[in-house]
Amino acid sequence: MTFRLTRALCGAMLALGMMVATIAPAAAQYWQCAPYAREISGIQIFGNANTWWSQSEGKYAHGAAPKVGAVMAFKANGRMRVGHVAMVSGIVSDREVLLTHANWSRGGQIERDVRAIDVSSAGDWSEVKVWFGPIGDLGQTRFPVYGFIYADQPAAEKPMQIASLSGGSSAQKLRK
């Protein structure tokens, strides 16, 4: 092998190595469900998914009706020990929604607009089945759900009574 050929091969390998090193960090993004749901919904709650429902109390309105942009909060269950959160990206019917979420079908990956159906006997979204990529269909597992946290609605403001600074017995009611 000539010096020129060796030098050219080394240069090509170095250039290829730099391209792979540049691409690798972006391709290696691994999303957990909670940080991804926070990123796309704007709901500023931190910690494991199974704590989002209780943490939303007093900060965000929540309920049993799905709305686009709301976060569906799953309870911890079986192999899903820390719960799950997913943003509602579409409403198909009163018992079917589309979810956008991470770390469900494949570890760390994002799935957009996948089906979830209400399988609760009361039709109250307390139990759902969710699309599972590896089988190309809804899974068999029925997942318990707390409900939906609404990103665009702050919790109802409650009056707060504070003492008067004048030393009198009158008090003022203020809104938070």
PLM segments and residue spans:
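Intrinsically disordered, low-complexity regions enriched in Ser/Pro/Gly/Gln/His and often acidic
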Residues: 23-24, 45-46, 88, 97, ...
